[in-house]
């Protein structure tokens, strides 16, 4: 992709901004659901890698998008500039929100869903409840961890069993990262507790 602008580049130049928009659109197009190609975009499974995105970062972006001047729909380059984020950081964040059905990426833009608006407008308890619902519905790994805990008489489960299952589908490094993200997200939503030293999930201290 040729960039016909000499250094230093004027970021306010309309032609330059248009090119940035076009690049963002190309990079996010793959994330846009195509009704005619449903088979090419299968639903998430337990083997779906989860990015190392924290809930504070997701909350911050949702709040930013819900507030003026965006009011739920924003141009990705504008958001990246406002938050002083690089594209490589913003896209995984947007994709995490899309996985949770809290936002949608479309042709270089990001748009809040109704669930995303509810989260952004809610208090702490509402947000945790909304996040828990999203995890149960759209992140099979977290849903499976909670299901196993619910079904066991002592409501405990070793992280090893889930890590081993993930390693059937991805590298040990990706499996470890995916499990860390699942733990972080599940804890925030108060779906389970996790003992780091024992590497064990439980329902202790969960209301």
Describe each PLM feature range:
Residues 1-25:
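Conserved beta-strand-loop-alpha-helix hinge in the C-terminal portion
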Residues 24, 37-38:
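C-terminal coupling/interaction segments
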Residues 27-33:
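Juxtadomain coupling helices with adjacent low-complexity linkers
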Residues 38-207:
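Donor-sugar nucleotide-binding helix/loop cap in glycosyltransferases
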